[in-house]
Swiss-Prot record:
It comes from the Bacteria. Its cofactor is Mg(2+). The gene is upp. Belongs to the UPRTase family. It comes from Wolinella succinogenes (strain ATCC 29543 / DSM 1740 / CCUG 13145 / JCM 31913 / LMG 7466 / NCTC 11488 / FDC 602W). This is Uracil phosphoribosyltransferase. Keywords: Allosteric enzyme, Glycosyltransferase, GTP-binding, Magnesium, Nucleotide-binding, Transferase.
């Protein structure tokens, strides 16, 4: 298990853009997707390659390809949808599933409302994506469910994380690697990441 805060000037710049309350919906979505690509770049360092032979304009040569058939991307709805385009731009042949979980604003407990996964999900390593890791409840629920379906490896990608959420996920699932664009200070008394960026789902879809 590893918790990796991905350090890069481009990430810092784009995190500033999505934190800014004056950033419009279009720019927010674009920056979110770009940060997602940068995180995935780091998270895919350990992917296995298959040796192949290709023909260049000059000769045949040994080369390597990713085994995309072994990968799946699963966003936690709805905010996780904002990360999908950025992730899929790098691994376009991966399959996509969806898990719908929302947080009860009074109890802060996760509530499940939807799930659709590839039929062969038990043969795939999954990148689970959600912009915000706050209390960790939604992530833990989603990881629990993926493991119950036989998924051999789950890697969690998020944009912002609170220390409390990181601790909760690593305690519940010590085998899951977590890649984070930025670790924030703390949770507020209402369970929001501070200083945060607001409600990621609302900002992705322009609903507030």
């Amino acid at each position: 298990m590893a918790v990796i805060e991905v350090k890069h000037p481009l990430i810092e710049h784009k995190i500033t853009n999505i934190r800014d309350v004056n950033t419009d919906t279009k720019s927010f979505k674009e920056n979110l997707a770009e940060i997602s690509s940068l995180i995935l770049y780091e998270a895919t360092k350990q992917l296995e390659l298959q040796e192949v032979e290709v023909e260049t304009p000059l000769t045949k040569t040994k080369a390597y390809r990713l085994s995309d058939s072994s990968l799946a991307v699963v966003p936690i709805l709805r905010a996780g949808l904002g990360m999908v385009d950025g992730v899929m731009s790098l691994i376009p042949n991966a399959r996509i599933g969806h898990i719908g979980v929302y947080r009860d604003e009074e109890t802060l407990e996760p509530k499940h409302y939807y799930c659709k996964l590839p039929e062969d999900i038990a043969k795939r390593s999954v990148f689970l994506v959600d912009p915000m890791l706050a209390t960790g409840g939604s992530a833990i629920y989603a990881i629990d469910y993926l493991k119950s379906q036989g998924v051999p490896k789950v890697t969690f990608l998020c944009i912002l994380a609170a220390p409390e959420g990181i601790k909760a996920v690593t305690t519940a699932h010590p085998d899951v690697d977590i890649f984070i664009a930025k670790i924030d200070e703390r949770l507020t008394e209402h369970g929001y990441i501070f200083p945060g960026l607001g409600d990621a789902g609302d900002r992705v879809f322009g609903t507030k």
